[in-house]
Amino acid sequence: MNKYTGISTLENMSQAEFYNKWTFDKFKDYVRGDILEVGCGIGNFTLTLSKYGKITAIDIDQSLVENLKKDKSYSINAGYGDIEKNDYFFQKKTFDTIICLNVLEHVQNDTKALGNMFKLLKKGGYLILLVPLYNFLFGEIDKSIGHFRRYNPKELVKRVQDLGYDIVSYRKLNLIGLIGWFITGKILKNKQITGYKIKLFNLVSPVLYLENLIEPPIGTSILIVAKRNK
């Protein structure tokens, strides 16, 4: 698994408060019980998740984990974890919900990582997976923040099913972000998402509510909710 190289991008994305809340609202009904956040980063979703259950947060970057543990607003159990290597600071623990948001694309052997998450999931538990879509969008930003790939939606859904998960739902998200990502990363060849671009995105983000009415045919990301039934 790639150690995250886009800390500034994570910090800038923390300012996309409307988008982060809108995204969380898409899966919050499945967040419960013992929660594992895979790749917590700087904690853009961690505090919100901690209000829905008992949270364990892992990241391959120990320094990010230590910063989270210093923040007294969190009530979490945080430590080192590499989902690809099946190596964690905890032992013999399973979870009701596993959250993996914009992490799988940083993992070289993503199939192995998905399989390891299945092992960590209790029977009846949910995996919530958010990943970037479409290799035609793969550009300088993806390279600079350590992405190995972007995903084909049908292929990823099938791969998740083949590993034993039952698909509860999946949908493409953030059509307007796709346009910005293509211009920024492919045409302008920028290597990061700047704070200025996030401010522009915040201005147009209310348009995302239209996606609550109808799923866009394409999007920047796909959100998959899967369940372990066996």
Positions of predicted regions on the chain:
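Conserved N-terminal segment of class I S-adenosyl-L-methionine
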Residues: 1-93, 97-101, 112-114, 217-222
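Feature marks short, surface-exposed loop/turn motifs that line or immediately flank catalytic pockets
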Residues: 64, 87, 135-137, 176
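Residues lining the SAM
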Residues: 101-104, 130
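A short glycine-rich, Lys/Arg-flanked "PGG" loop and its adjoining helix->strand segment in the class I
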Residues: 111-126
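Conserved S-adenosyl-L-methionine
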Residues: 165-175
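Short, glycine-/aromatic-enriched active-site segment of Class I SAM-dependent methyltransferases
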Residues: 127-149, 155-159
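A C-terminal cap/extension of S-adenosyl-L-methionine-dependent methyltransferases
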Residues: 3, 14, 88, 174-230
